Curated annotation (Swiss-Prot):
Residue numbers binding substrate: 50, 115, 192
Remaining remarks: Part of the biosynthetic pathway for all classes of flavonoids, a large class of secondary plant metabolites, many of which are brightly colored.
SUPFAM superfamilies per the UniProt record, alphabetical: Chalcone isomerase
Biological process, per Gene Ontology: flavonoid biosynthetic process
Catalytic reactions on record: a chalcone = a flavanone
Name of protein: Chalcone--flavanone isomerase
GO molecular function: chalcone isomerase activity
């Protein structure tokens, strides 16, 4: 796979996203596809709340290159299928959501769940199993508090496992706090971040600008 010297880190505000990370929970190594801020415009001012980094298993390179190698960033950023292939691709994703401003777990998860449920209903995949998965998601965040710099990690496996872990900083925990077994719910989390109604256009731009070099030659410039 591409290694640390050939992939650049990303800095979002005071939050550092390393080029390559290894999860002690899975013993797998992931490279940084992209990272960006998420915020809201409140009374005419854009307030940054979180920074999101999407890490990909090395299998992602061959999987995505089949269709997207040679495509320029300008084309990818406007192509929903590119992001959908990241979301649904047969490789693991590790998503880090770190807080710029303090949020309670309930405050943070409420909006994530609203967006996920809206997406699942819009595509007709919200049933009893998904409702149960969303309930498990809500429960996982109830006792969590996120001071600035604290993180949630989402591990998404190709077979539909969504593993959640929480950290006071950017350190990946050795064990996952919760495992949710629902493929639709797992995919919806990343869909809301980089899909059709993405909460982080900045993250989409980062993925589109960085991944072409990886797909073309294994190097991010």
């Amino acid at each position: 796979m591409a290694t640390a010297p050939t992939i650049t880190d990303v800095q979002v505000e005071f939050l550092h996203f390393p080029a390559v990370v290894t999860s002690p929970a899975t013993a797998k190594t992931y490279f940084l596809g992209g990272a960006g801020e998420r915020g809201l415009t409140i009374e005419g001012k854009f307030i940054k709340f979180t920074a999101i980094g999407v890490y990909l298993e090395d299998k992602a390179v061959a999987s995505l290159a089949t269709k997207w190698k040679g495509k320029p960033s300008e084309e990818l950023i406007n192509t929903l299928d590119f992001y959908r292939d990241i979301i649904s691709g047969p490789f693991e994703k590790l998503i880090r959501g770190s807080k710029i401003l303090q949020l309670s777990g309930t405050e943070y998860s409420r909006k994530v769940m609203e967006n996920c449920v809206a997406h699942l209903k819009s595509v007709g995949t919200y049933g009893d199993a998904e409702a149960k998965g969303i309930e498990e998601f809500a429960e996982a965040f109830k006792k969590v508090n996120f001071p600035p710099g604290a993180s949630v990690f989402y591990r998404q496996s190709p077979d539909g496992i969504l593993g959640l872990s929480f950290s006071e900083d950017a350190t990946i925990p050795g064990e996952e706090a919760v495992v949710i077994e629902n493929k639709a719910v797992s995919a919806a989390v990343l869909e809301t971040m980089i899909g059709e109604h993405a909460v982080s256009p900045d993250l989409k731009r980062s993925l589109a600008s960085r991944l072409p070099a990886v797909l073309n030659g294994g190097i991010i410039v």
